[in-house]
Amino acid sequence: MQTAEIGIIGGSGLYAMPGLTGVREHVVETPFGEPSDALMLGELEGRRVAFLARHGRGHRLLPSELNFRANIYAMKELGVERILSVSAVGSLKEEHKPTDFVIPDQFIDRTFARVGTFFGEGVVAHVGFGDPVCATVAETFALACAEIGVVGKRGGTYVCMEGPQFSTRAESNLYRSLGADVIGMTNLQEAKLAREAEICYATMAMVTDYDCWREGHDDVTVEQVVAVLHQNSENAAKVVKAAVRAMPKERTCGCGEALKYAILTDRAAIPKAAKERLGLLLEKYL
């Protein structure tokens, strides 16, 4: 039975979902360990929703400490078909100003200490990731920004860095030379794992600062980030609410069949332990 149809992952500044009614806390156990926190289940704009605070309530977890596999698996277990992600980012372009929202459609991976797949240990799968976000969810985010009257820029490249330190000036300028738009520490692994779980995914990145590349502008600090987050979290919640309301009920994209031709391992060669661990993802293909 589907417990939730839409998942919301709230990042820095969005630790709860205003307007969520009939809220009940749900603790999920996964084959990959515990998610960042209990998931909050309820209704938002007449839709069944599961909300997860990415860093845990009280912001307890570093980006490198996040159990991305458990977070996405928990959403899958609850029946979630679409994930709306919200996160804080630094801007790598003059045109993306603090308090703007950017809805990226590409990623560059600069992480090195994370697991970004459910597979391995007996199962080999290679999902397509040329277009790493769901166009339907991204467009719904963009339309919701327009409805609320905030700047929501569709498209762009998100650099995902390891952290927890912010960039050096050399790194920031390198990413700018690549044409990247924003920089953050969390969204790439979510996008990869959501694709493997056949869940539609897109993120709305809240610009809080100009990283450290901009001459005549202070380098990014936590104090600066928090100040902008407090200013913008209300708008972020309004956009998410509008996006949930406008989200099409039926999926017409290809996200729901991402694994159809991706599994290379002979079905007869998949170990029993792997089938048990990945049954939720593989059941329709075994």
Where is each model-derived feature located?
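Metabolite-binding pocket within alpha/beta catalytic cores that recognizes anionic/polar moieties
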Residues: M1-D131, Y285-L286
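Short acidic/polar active-site loop segments enriched in Thr and Asp
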Residues: E81-R82, D181, C200
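Active-site/ligand-binding-proximal alpha/beta "capping" segment
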Residues: E147-D181
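His/Asp/Glu-rich mid-to-C-terminal helical/loop segments that flank catalytic regions of hydrolases
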Residues: C212-L259
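Non-catalytic positions within long, well-ordered alpha-helices that form the structural scaffold/packing
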Residues: K76-G79, R176, R195
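Zn-dependent metallopeptidase/amidohydrolase metal-coordination segment
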Residues: M185-E223
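Generic non-transmembrane alpha-helical segments
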Residues: T136, T140-V151, K238-A246
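A short, charged, Gly/Pro-tolerant segment at domain boundaries
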Residues: T252-L286
